[in-house]
Structure formats: structure tokens, C-alpha cells
């Protein structure tokens, strides 16, 4: 993201701050026999691939975060997207929409809860962006297989707002 890139440039000489981009490369490398990656599969059929995509997103994000914590024990770690966003925005939204089934959602929550203690989160930086702006950015970056309707981005925005408004102290 632009924000993470700019922060990384600002802290380039500070080895106490570590930056982690979204692990899209990992997602692109998981392919079926026809060469379609997980991002393509997810956006072409969310009902079928919502659970597997969310598990993969969480596992890959958690994996790079745990590695960063281990390799940089006294550093501030800034991630492009928080693992809590996986649970409280994307997985929750897909579950509410009936795209992740009840039993799969329970499995997801168990997996999430089992490992989340390994990576304590002390603060969130939330850059609120209008869905229309996000839509333009998605089109501009033109990532392979990423066809995201503006309605999906609007719902993501609403779920971010709901989750964060519940977690902001009065």
C-alpha cells in the first residue's frame, strides 16, 4: 500500500521498525492444475472459495507476522493489513453473507483464536478511504484475477467501521 511504502521510506534508517506488506505473492503461488491462483478462484466464485481463501489469507499473514516478531523481538511491526481484519471484516462479512458455512466459520474462529496470542497487537492505524477511491485503486493496480465489485468494497468499508467503532475507547 502507499501508506506502508511511505512509512517504510520515512523509517528507512530506523531498524526498530519493521514493515510487512500483504502476502499477495504467496496467494498468487497457490494454483490449481489449470494455473488459476487463489485470488482468481476467490473472486470468480466466493461461495465455493471463501473459506479456503480466508484460511489461506490468515495463515499466510500470521506466518509472516510470527516470523517478523521472532526475528525482530524489540521492534515495532507495521503490517499492511492486520490479522484481526481477516477475522472481524472479511471472514465475518462472508459468514454473514452465507458464503462461509457455519461449521467452516467455527473452524476458522478456532484456528484464529488458537494462534492470535502469538502476535499481540497494541494499536491500529486505520486509513479510512471511500469505496469509490478503493475501487479506482483496484482498477489502477490491475492485479491478475482481482475483479472486485464496488458493492463488495462498500460492504468491507461498513464492516471496518462497525468493527473499529466497537473497539475505540470512549
Where are these regions (language model features)?
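Anionic group-transfer/hydrolysis microenvironments
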Residues: 23-24, 82-83, 130
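A basic- and aromatic-enriched beta-loop-alpha substructure that forms the phosphate/nucleotide-
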Residues: 53-101, 125
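Short glycine-/polar-rich loops that comprise or flank the Walker A/P-loop
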Residues: 15, 118-123, 168-170
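A glycine- and Lys/Arg-enriched "phosphate-lid" helix/loop adjacent to the NTP-binding pocket
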Residues: 87-159
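A generic structural motif
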Residues: 13-17, 74-76, 119
